[in-house]
Amino acid sequence: MAPHEKGVNPSESPSGSLKKAPPSGPKALRGFASPSAFRNAGIGNGLLQHRGEDERISFAFPRKGKESLDRNGERPAPMSLESRLGPPVSRFNRPVGGDSLERGNGKGGWDNRDERTSASSSSIHRINKEKIRPRSDFIESSANLYSEDDRNRDRGRYHERDRSRGTNGDRGGGEGHSHREPGRGKEHQNGQGRDRSLYRDHSRERESSRDERDRYSEEYKHQRSKARFSPSPSPERSRLKSSLGRHRSPVSVSSSSSSSARSPPPVQNREPLRYNGSQSKNGEKELSNGLLENSISRSGVSIAVPRKLETKQLVRPSPPHVNLKSTIQDNPSPPTGKYPPSPPSLDILSKPSCNREPLPDQRPPTPPLPENSSPTSPSLESSRFDQNQHLLPDELPLPPLSISFPQKPVSSSSLSRLSSLSAALSRPNPLDKDGTSMPPSFHFREISNRHQRLSPPNNAENQLPETSIIPPPPSETVPEPPWIRPPYIPPPCTKHRPGIGNFFITNLREKVEDKSGKEEKRVDGMEGGKVVQVTDPRLSMTEEQRGRGRGSSKQRAAFYELTYEWDLYSVTPKPPSPPTAVLITGLGPLTTVDQITKFLRPHGRIKEIDSKVDRKTDMQLGICWVKFEGPPLGRPGTAHDVASMAVKVCDGKKISMGGERIRVVLDGRGKRAEQAVKEEMERRYPPKKPSALPSDMKVTPLSGTAMATTSRPPNAPNASTPLIDKQTFDTSAKAPIIRPGVLKPLGQKMYHRPSAPPLVFNNHRFRDESFLNRPFNAGAGMISQQQMGYKILPGKPVQQLASSFTSAPFVRHPRERREDSWTNERGRRLKGESSTRHWRARSLSRSSYSSYSSYSSYSEESEEERPRHPTKVPYPQRKRLATGPSKEDEYKMEDVREAIRENGHPCVFIDAKSLPAAREYESRQSHLGWYILFADDTTAYRVQRVLDTTAVQGHRLSLVVHTSSGPRAQTDASEPVTGGVGESKKGNWRYLTITKKSRPMPAVKKSGKSATIRRKVYSPSVSGSDDDDEQVPVMAQNRKRAPSYASSTSPLSEDDRPFARSVQREERDIDKEGKFSLIGKKADVVSVKAAKGPKSKTIRVDSDEVEENQGVPLASIGEVTKAEGKQDDSTVVKLETLLSESISELTKGKKRPTKAKGGKATKKVRLDQEADDAATKIQIDEDIVPQPPKKKKVVKTEVDKLLASGVLMDEEDAYWLGRVLAAQEDGLEPIWSDGEEDLVDEGHPLFHKSGAWRAEGWKKVAQVQKSRYLPQRNRAVVNSEDVGGITTGRTARLAGRDQHRQTAAVAANNTVESDLFAFNQLRIRKKQLRFARSAIEGYGLYAMETIHAGEMVCEYVGDLVRATVADVREQRYLKQGIGSSYLFRIDNDIVCDATFKGSVSRLINHSCDPSANAKIIKVNGQSKIVIYAERTLYPGEEILYDYKFPLESDPALRVPCLCGAATCRGWLN
């Protein structure tokens, strides 16, 4: 049973210590026995055994009740166990000296036997090593108990057994037992007559012993895991355990099973432990109860047994239970101290019995007791026993735990150490409260001298205790001083051997220069037997050199800038990454991109390649920029490594067949490429050198008339200041070139301020040729060009710019307001400067920078090297949007609305948020965006469909179509413009009902002569300074413009606004075509339709109202004087503004303006027409007298009253109210369509009989029917009568002849060489194309740039198959539901199938009036399908060509044509 189950502390369990034998009783004690188990178990000759790791000790105690006596009537002598080697053994296995562990005649003694080593089972129990035997601290106690009667009855029978049995036989211990010899299956003859019932009882007992042993083995494992970590009860006891562990072997009580059947075979080459009993007088051993160790134990351990000093005989102590009764009476009371008492002495083992003489006291002398203390008897620890402790004597202590004995016996020489330890333990404990000291815990006996040879002193001291014993604290020792290497002492004498030692070649330099020189050595610092004096080379250095230092200790003369690797926490901008691109120059003009790619592909993967071309001829410049993505797959490295390798390997190589050697350099950011292109273009197209002025040309002062005209009034302090400073012009300098009609050079001021130097545009890249081409009329009194020092060039016609999507001309305002950064004064400068390139005049509707090729992308870093004007910034920042629109923005927005209302057609609005940063020359839009006007209703939708979300310089355009809410432009000038809502005549307002059937009406072209309205504006010059308080009249000059331009300005100019500094003239031109294309900031297009008239007319507009300097917008009211015949009277009709945009809506930060739907005029004008049918005459008033501004009260109209009352909320409500009033005047009742469904006719494709779309199911609508109701579709249905009339009429014949002449001319010029040239140019630079929804059917292909007639558009590519395969594929495509056919027949055998393998060229739709044609050419023996332009294609125009399908006779197989052209045949085949 485990110790913890009986209340025994595992740390104090009796493992490894000698335990008192339990009282007599019928039961056997096994395992760990608590004190209560000792009391309850009365056993006879019990056996207690302890098993250690390498030793085992067994001894027996006689029974208390009937003590067994020897033949002399005395108690047996004390037992004595020797080591596992035992006494000296002879060759015949006999101990030397006659000590044999043999059983005698059964009377308790021992005598010598030859081969027998077994003992009597009546007095001892033979110990067997079990297979399940655990480690040393496991205790197993078992004994076979018999009654005394049984032992006396079987004693004689037992000793009469046959002595011929094997000496190593292991039999059970107990008389009357059945003994079985090893290897023999029969029962011993002496045991045949014993009692069978006793045999069965003993068999059952053996079985139970085996079961308990198995159970104890499992309990041992659990006990050992706890005992390893159990603390020691007290420091004193721990020291005692350590001391006992070093000097004594552990003692344990154990017994094994008596069954010989379970005994394992003996261990070979191991001598048994023999017991020496007391000898008789005649020299024979006295038989006594003793202990026998079998031969299979792990290792033998000797226990010291005391001897008599007189006879030198072993003395066997009496068992502890002999004086049990007397001991109980003398049991002292347990101590009450704080600390537990020391364990009692072990001299109880040597206490003599009552029949023997007491042994001499071998204990060390008791130390003297301290003063005022009385000796006290030792007491047992009260914490070790349970409630039945009073039944046990004092002399039965529990020995300490796990006290391990050494494997060899301890010699007597170590008694002195033990005595000193005992004396130390017997000293008084200073921690006791009463100051008394305890006696020594143990008294040690002298160890026999016969074992000295087996236990040397050093072995006993070197034994270590078990792991469970806490070692004593080490003594404090002084650390030894560190070891110091002794100094080296050379030997007393050394002899130098010649030729051996360190040497130095003295004539090394001479040897190198002259190979025949003999080498001289200096050995051991001696030359010629003399020691060479060595000098320090540093002494030869100057003081400056020594102060500066050398090597790592060199001092710096100045501070060095430290550089660190850039990371996320650096404050400086991130440096550019290592270059991964190269620039190749020196290429031949015929070198293609494929050749360059093939040449560079082995070095790495190419990410981008840009071959620079001439922008005028689209030919190669011999410059190519290549960017690498990385090394080839499977190779290590980076793109920078590839670029560096390409520079090393490819520089100076040849690519093309021309033999030109290329030059390759690193160019990571493309700056070198830009510079190379610039230099090459300047080399090809050098700028023209301006002609020098004559030496006699001088700058003459201004005349008085000019001074009076251009200067301020006389009351100004600086009125006499000339217009142009004399220091501005230098006679020796080259004069810039100026166009005819220009008043002054660009950049020159017209006012009395320090003028800026004139801008010379010959070498300036940022200029606008279209502005220079615009004429200016030189008025009277202006400065002559000869006086200003400019050379007059011969005049030439104005350059015609390419039109936009609708061929509408572009207009630009010649000037705008800005700050002068040179003089830091406010003023105005002409805005003709442009940052477009000097080799090409760009269209204003497109980006200002054209891409070099389709492969390249624009680099912002290249702009750092571009020349620029000191005051011109090519990339100004976008203006910060204020919280609300300013007054200037309101004026601009009003002008835009007026232009939209007068145009009357839908317009496209480009949101300013989608535009890139505004440049100076592009600032002609309102603060909300750009408005683009067109001459018809369909162009705006087409432009929005094609160009919406188009990327321009990295920004996506956002196009929104705004439908004009105002009336269409008036075509009859005889109808006066009314200012009231009720004054509208019948027909002016067209009542619209918004339904799906309604389609926009086409614009009607009006014919008539153009008229020019000249307007004279008198405006005060307002300024905050003293010298700007005067008014300067400016005369508006007449000019005649080119027919293709629509020149117009804002009706409310900049200088008519608050705080304007000067006067600006305004002109309004009336074009008979009435077309506009662009409305920009500070330049608003206003369409004024000239009316039909048989007579010439003279129109004069006088401004009789000017604006006050109070921040109120100027209400310009003009007077139109009509002279009819000779009549002098004139009628003035005043116009007033009816409605305006609500200011509060603009201040709320709206992103887009409210759709202008008002159809009313903003001014009242009285127009008097002349009856004469003559040319238009312009009258100029010579005498112009500025008049002071007049305040005029604005008369409120009916509309103003409605707005004030809240009936009308905005301009849109007023517009629809006017429509309703106009319909009432016509006698029409308004039709309110709210809540009504849009009904269609029965013949309409969308008509449904059931009234519900879902009830009709799904059906396919033909493409022809879709064109009837879809607004984005063309009119595909063409009447056959109209077609016949057109084809047979005179107009058709004329058109056919003209087309035939053009075709013949193109055919004469287009040869095979020209086609190949065009094809090669397409491979160099592809045209910019885009596919989008087509108005004909499905998707279509649109041109994104201007493509002139005869130029190649694209190539029709696809899969080339045979004709039979094409027929099979066509049927399969029809079954798969692919309705479109992309099969293009090249000849009778080959067909190009672009259904799954094609480009955007397959999306080109058919048209009976095509804009392109397809040709089949051969390149290197291979047929190519190439699309050429028949006429000029403008950006946004769809590319169409005639499919030329063969005609079908069967009407069921014919495909209707949806092109909607005037010459449409109606069918494709």
From Swiss-Prot:
Catalytic activity: L-lysyl(4)-[histone H3] + 3 S-adenosyl-L-methionine = N(6),N(6),N(6)-trimethyl-L-lysyl(4)-[histone H3] + 3 S-adenosyl-L-homocysteine + 3 H(+); N(6)-methyl-L-lysyl(4)-[histone H3] + S-adenosyl-L-methionine = N(6),N(6)-dimethyl-L-lysyl(4)-[histone H3] + S-adenosyl-L-homocysteine + H(+); N(6),N(6)-dimethyl-L-lysyl(4)-[histone H3] + S-adenosyl-L-methionine = N(6),N(6),N(6)-trimethyl-L-lysyl(4)-[histone H3] + S-adenosyl-L-homocysteine + H(+)
Limits of the Post-SET domain: 1453-1469
Family matches, as CDD domains: RRM_spSet1p_like
Biased composition (Polar residues): 291-300, 455-464, 963-973
UniProt-annotated stretches for the region Disordered: 1-478, 676-699, 805-839, 858-891, 963-984, 999-1068
Compartments (UniProt record): Nucleus; Chromosome
Primary site of residence: nucleus
Binding-site residues for S-adenosyl-L-methionine, renumbered to this chain: Y1443
GO cellular component, one term: Set1C/COMPASS complex
The entry's keywords: Chromatin regulator, Chromosome, Methyltransferase, Nucleus, S-adenosyl-L-methionine, Transferase
Domain SET: 1327-1444
Compositional bias annotation for Low complexity: 250-262, 371-382, 411-427
EC number: 2.1.1.354
Class of the enzyme per the UniProt entry, highest EC level: transferase
Ranges that cross the membrane: none
UniProt cross-references to SMART domains, sorted A to Z: N-SET, PostSET, SET
GO molecular function annotations of the record: histone H3K4 trimethyltransferase activity; RNA binding
Compositionally biased region (Basic residues): 1006-1017
InterPro entries: COMPASS_Set1_N-SET, Nucleotide-bd_a/b_plait_sf, Post-SET_dom, RBD_domain_sf, Set1-like, SET_dom, SET_dom_sf
Biased composition (Pro residues): 332-344, 361-370
PANTHER family: HISTONE-LYSINE N-METHYLTRANSFERASE SETD1
Subunit architecture: Component of the Set1C/COMPASS complex.
Function: Catalytic component of the COMPASS (Set1C) complex that specifically mono-, di- and trimethylates histone H3 to form H3K4me1/2/3. Binds RNAs which might negatively affect its histone methyltransferase activity. COMPASS recognizes ubiquitinated H2B on one face of the nucleosome which stimulates the methylation of H3 on the opposing face.
Recorded family membership: Belongs to the class V-like SAM-binding methyltransferase superfamily.
Protein's name in the database: Histone-lysine N-methyltransferase, H3 lysine-4 specific
Organism whose genome encodes this protein: Cryptococcus neoformans var. neoformans serotype D (strain B-3501A) (Filobasidiella neoformans)
